[in-house]
Amino acid sequence: MGVKKKLKLTSLLGLSLLIMTACATNGVTSDITAESADFWSKLVYFFAEIIRFLSFDISIGVGIILFTVLIRTVLLPVFQVQMVASRKMQEAQPRIKALREQYPGRDMESRTKLEQEMRKVFKEMGVRQSDSLWPILIQMPVILALFQALSRVDFLKTGHFLWINLGSVDTTLVLPILAAVFTFLSTWLSNKALSERNGATTAMMYGIPVLIFIFAVYAPGGVALYWTVSNAYQVLQTYFLNNPFKIIAEREAVVQAQKDLENRKRKAKKKAQKTK
């Protein structure tokens, strides 16, 4: 997926999160209980019960933290697919850049040819643009269900964790700031191994945390806690499973090996010329 498309997706995600916030705070406010009949209410209450079970009678906040870790661990294969897709996309960028230089025209024929050649590159390198969307799409109903659980299930909306009323916004802004910081670290680590960067990439790196901060400011404290833990988990996942520093070192090793091979060939050629 190109950077411009990612920016559009990020904007759409931010708008969706704000809409979800409005739905949770200004939408249906009737309580959800074990007797609620519709499917969505049953799903919301099921999530609430999982959180209560994981709280171990210590704190609902502990339950949300463990619930987040559980969700992220279950979704780990999906997120790993996203990370692999992102890495393949990074590796494809030099070839994509060359194609854009080869077909710079804005006419329909040039654009069609460019898209055809780009599809060939993506297919050859095993890049599927949809792989980047799955983690976002899967997490959306989870976050929305958590919104609803914190505003409509009694034992969650009255829960506390440290100084936070989990059913209300965090007026101290500590959690929104932490959510933004961990989002930035996650994005920064993901972009660290990029062989090429541009203004759009930088805009994403700073823009996504801003969107998350705004979202977390107006969200219930429990949702801000979920987002903070989720992105902290993402930082650890990226570092241990897709370490950008290791990727950079491997890339530099390949470049150095190529230089060494060229130097040996050059020396061998000079030596052969001297013996003639």
Curated annotation (Swiss-Prot):
**What happens when the protein's gene is inactivated?**
Alters the localization of KhpB which localizes not only to the midcell but also the old cell poles. No change in localization of MltG.
Where found, per UniProt?
A: Cell membrane
**What protein is this chain from?**
Membrane protein insertase YidC 2
Quaternary context? Interacts with KhpB (also called EloR/Jag).
Which region is the signal sequence?
1-22
Task: Using the UniProt record, give the first listed, main subcellular location.
Answer: membrane
Q: Where is the lipid attached (S-diacylglycerol cysteine)?
A: 23
Under HAMAP family, the record lists: YidC_type2 (MF_01811)
Q: Name one Pfam family in it.
A: 60KD_IMP
Ranges annotated as spanning the membrane:
58-78, 130-150, 169-189, 207-227
The UniProt gene name for this protein comes to yidC2
* Sites of N-palmitoyl cysteine lipidation: 23
Per the record, membrane topology reads:
Multi-pass membrane protein
Q: Which UniProt keywords apply?
A: Cell membrane, Chaperone, Lipoprotein, Membrane, Palmitate, Protein transport, Signal, Transmembrane, Transmembrane helix, Transport
GO MF annotation terms: membrane insertase activity
Instruction: Please indicate if the UniProt record lists NADP as a keyword.
Output: no
What's a GO biological-process term for it?
A: protein insertion into membrane
By sequence similarity, the record places it as follows:
Belongs to the OXA1/ALB3/YidC family. Type 2 subfamily.
UniProt entry tagged with the keyword rRNA-binding? no
Give a Gene Ontology cellular component term annotated to this protein: plasma membrane
Role, per record = Required for the insertion and/or proper folding and/or complex formation of integral membrane proteins into the membrane. Involved in integration of membrane proteins that insert both dependently and independently of the Sec translocase complex, as well as at least some lipoproteins.
